[in-house]
């Protein structure tokens, strides 16, 4: 946020439902709301800033990491006219994959606990499968209108790189623009200083190209 503010951008970091530190009710209000009410919280925040005269509604980009990467992709699918570009960092692209990919560290150590957690917070693979498909960005890539920058660690064990590759391939098949940045030897986040610097350089260049301050 400080980097983007330093480059002249207004930055919104909403505590959408499910954010920690706001009590049980706030947390539970996010259950089975990926791409739904959780996504609407972000959209409502943008509309509030627009109403306050802080943000030009025609010059908004969305970006984030992990769940924020998912929210980026889902925002581009759900509100394609709202955003000029998106930056998905180690983001989830398919809610079914998130549960079925056995090589994610989230569900490989204690599969039974992971299954129960996902069934409560994201949706049950059987009972809620149609909902999970509906709110998986990879399955609706044709709705995306804005260019996307993907940033991922090749060795990500939390959100395997297949999520980025799957969304990239779906965008390519739909004729949609994207940029691609993968760091070898990195996981669910970037630890090497040279990689962090390159990430910031690419993010700044991408934003200046598609949504200059």
Task: Briefly describe each language-model feature range.
Residues 1-7, 13-213:
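Active-site-proximal cap/loop segments of hydrolase catalytic domains
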